[in-house]
Amino acid sequence: MCSTSVYDLEDIPLEDDDPNSIEFKILAFYARHHVFKSTPAVFSPKLSRTRSLSQKALGTWSTDSWTQISLPCRDSLSSEKHISLGKKKSSWRTLFRVTEKEEEPPSSPKEIHAQGPFPVERQGRNQHWSRSLSSVEQCLESEAVDSKVACIANRVAEIVYSWPPPDDSQSQGGGKFKESVPKILHFELQGPQLRPCDSKKDGEDQIINRIVELLKYSGDQLGREIKRDKALVSIFQEGLSYSVFRTITDLFLRDVDTRGESEIKAQGFKAALAIDAIAKLTAIDNHPMNRMLGFGTKYLREYFSPWVQQNGGWEKILGLSHEEVD
């Protein structure tokens, strides 16, 4: 088990920062395997992410229709795994109605190998990510990873990377972002810095909205943009308080449009997006990893865990069968 300092637990009741809780373990596993793994072929913004619905059946989505990607569930972290990836156009950027001007080298192989612990560059733009990854590894390697945790985290990744774009589901249900997203949320990644503000409060609101927008991108792209923007660098050097953390996550989820879907489908998608966003925030904050994982654990317990347990647990709301978990 990883120990935390008093500073790590600032603003977090101890019971919400329990490294043995299912929420904490899911976030830690997801952060390590689906955010910090900065292999270009896996998480490049130009990566083709698979679609969960076929061209012939772009109707309402279901937990059963989420694309099955070969990710580790039962086996040890040290064994070599194969992750099969499709070649279709990325749906994630389309879902969030954003554009990326920065070109990345195309990823040629259809099948790539992921190995754990995953190697991360120790220099340049990945240096900060390496520090965070090391912190997560210490937590995960201190005890065996629960196969249930691995399956849940991997299912979250499947949902996040397989979501159909809004033009495919616009009139037939399916999650997307509402048409009424405030214009302030739409920033060109290569555009100018945040505009001057009349007050400190306006400046804070702009920074928060900027972070919300950037959370829609891949982890590597997010890291690059944070380093480019002096205002964002400043806020993350100081560290996020839980109240700001919660505001960012709330805004990120607020405009997800799941009208026409069942409560379980809608909440399952929002829970997956929340885990993805929280994991990215842990990657870019300068405070110890346990502190941010504690924030995420607290947030999930406040807004998702009670409902999840009332509806059969994480496996059920994410569409996992007993055979996949056992």
UniProtKB/Swiss-Prot annotation:
PTM notes: Phosphorylated by MELK, leading to inhibit its pro-apoptotic function.
Family matches, as PROSITE patterns: BCL2_FAMILY
Chain span(s) of sequence motif BH3: 211-225
Protein's GO biological process: apoptotic process; positive regulation of extrinsic apoptotic signaling pathway
Predominant localisation class: cytoplasm
Residues recorded as bearing Phosphoserine in the entry: S44
Function summary: Plays a role in apoptosis.
Recorded family membership: Belongs to the Bcl-2 family.
PANTHER family: APOPTOSIS FACILITATOR BCL-2-LIKE PROTEIN 14, SI:CH73-248E21.1
Name of the protein: Apoptosis facilitator Bcl-2-like protein 14
Organism: Rattus norvegicus
Lineage: Eukaryota, Metazoa, Chordata, Craniata, Vertebrata
